[in-house]
Amino acid sequence: MATFNLTIVSAEQKIFEGEVKQIQVTGVEGELGILPGHTPLLTAIKPGIVKFTLKDGNEEVIYVSGGFLEVQPNIVTVLADIAIRGSELDADRIHEAKRKAEENIVSRGSDADHDLLVAKLSKELAKLRAYELTEKLLKTRR
């Protein structure tokens, strides 16, 4: 199967660069699946999971806090404020941050910061999904 070059960059560092068979990411208008030779595209992406298949068939998962996706026929670039490999996520820290976000939503009720609190909770849930998906992928490799 054909491949293309994928680069995932956070504000701090390059997280991944290599040849992949496909990538799945959530754009602002829905889910995107990118294969080699895809039509050029530039779109914002939502906080969530970037899942891609390596040349050897193994899959990897990276959490992104949102950002931009640029697609060229043989090159795909993800630019994110924050990007963390699923294998580097800490489940305990995620659960604690999720719990605090839920408590803040309940305690503040209809406060003006409600949308920000919901966005924080959504990011923690996306991190949790990235962690769980990574764990599942690691178990299937064993």
UniProtKB/Swiss-Prot annotation:
Q: Which UniProt keywords apply?
A: ATP synthesis, Cell inner membrane, Cell membrane, CF(1), Hydrogen ion transport, Ion transport, Membrane, Transport
> What broad class describes the main subcellular location of this protein?
membrane
GO cellular component term of the entry, any: proton-transporting ATP synthase complex
Any GO molecular function: ATP binding
> Would the keyword Transport be found if you checked this record's keyword annotation?
yes
Q: Where in the cell is it found?
A: Cell inner membrane
Please cite one Gene Ontology biological process associated with this protein: proton motive force-driven ATP synthesis
Topology relative to the lipid bilayer, per the entry, is:
Peripheral membrane protein
The subunit field of the Swiss-Prot or TrEMBL record says: F-type ATPases have 2 components, CF(1) - the catalytic core - and CF(0) - the membrane proton channel. CF(1) has five subunits: alpha(3), beta(3), gamma(1), delta(1), epsilon(1). CF(0) has three main subunits: a, b and c.
Q: What does this gene product do?
A: Produces ATP from ADP in the presence of a proton gradient across the membrane.
The family note in this entry says: Belongs to the ATPase epsilon chain family.
Q: What is this protein called?
A: ATP synthase epsilon chain
